[in-house]
Amino acid sequence: MDLNKQILSRRPIIIALIAILVVLIGGGGFWVYRLAWAPNFKPDKTVYVYIDDKKDFDDLCRQLRDSANCLRIGSFKQLSGLLKYPASMRTGRYAVKPGMSNLTLLNDLRRGHQVAARVTFNNVRFKEDLAERISDQLMFGKENLLCLLNDSVYCDSLGFTPETIHALFIPNTYEIYWNISADKFIRRMKREYDAFWTPERLKKAEEIGLTPVEASILASIVEEETAASDEYPIVAGLYINRLHAGIPLQADPTVKFAVGDFSLQRILFEHLEIDSPYNTYKHAGLPPGPLRIPTIKGLNSVLNHTKHKYLYMCAKEDFSGRHNFAVTLAEHNRNANRYRAELNRRRIR
């Protein structure tokens, strides 16, 4: 009886202790949930954080605050410490999605589960432009890429020279991991180049009498020559006619390249006298390398050029960017005289 009385007397204390324990467990569970699984990032849309060799954990936290609308940066830091993440940061481009939790993001960061970047390049003329365009989209620096593109031994290992390396790059959109090295990026482009040059395309180039690199060089001239893409196959056919006939190309864009000024509106005799292997008024055949990185459309226009007898072309006097084509020199001279007259009328020197 006394024992029952003792138990009954202590019952409120036991209930209180159990209640406290439940509260503690519940509170601990809520704390763990809030720390690990509760949504902690609420950007308006998926954003990306970037970690390179120079960034530390504090830099990452700043990105999460500024770009990913982190609600509780302290909890992210706390869980990162518990998981020893700051000591094992991996470079890369990581997605932060609306409603993401600390643990989900940290699992991606710790395992290096990054999201590939969509790398695009087009309308690129010089290697310096290419290096800048690509380095703006990937982790490596402009100089890292330029160093390889200008290295004759490296280019030779890929079947190119520093003058022809432009031809390696086929303009398109590629999914590439942001932290790729410059060397691996170039080798990825080499695989894309090899995939582009199918047996069918190789056969077409061979039938014309061109290697893939020579086809790229010619395509670059074609694209610089006309602003009207529907003229590409006609212009390509014209230059192929001249190559087969042993006639110098006499392509104005090659002179502009030799001069180093693509803004020239009028090619003068002094420009034609520049002694450069790119000056196709002085040197027969194709120049040593592409004037720009040709597009797929430009390359295909060479491989599928229009068959005709044109040997001459001159910009139209309406300055539309289109051309008058001619079979004979006499016809060409008439076209050229009309164009020169319009240049004079507009006082373009």
Task: Give the label of every model feature segment.
Residues F30-W197:
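Signal peptide-directed extracytoplasmic domains
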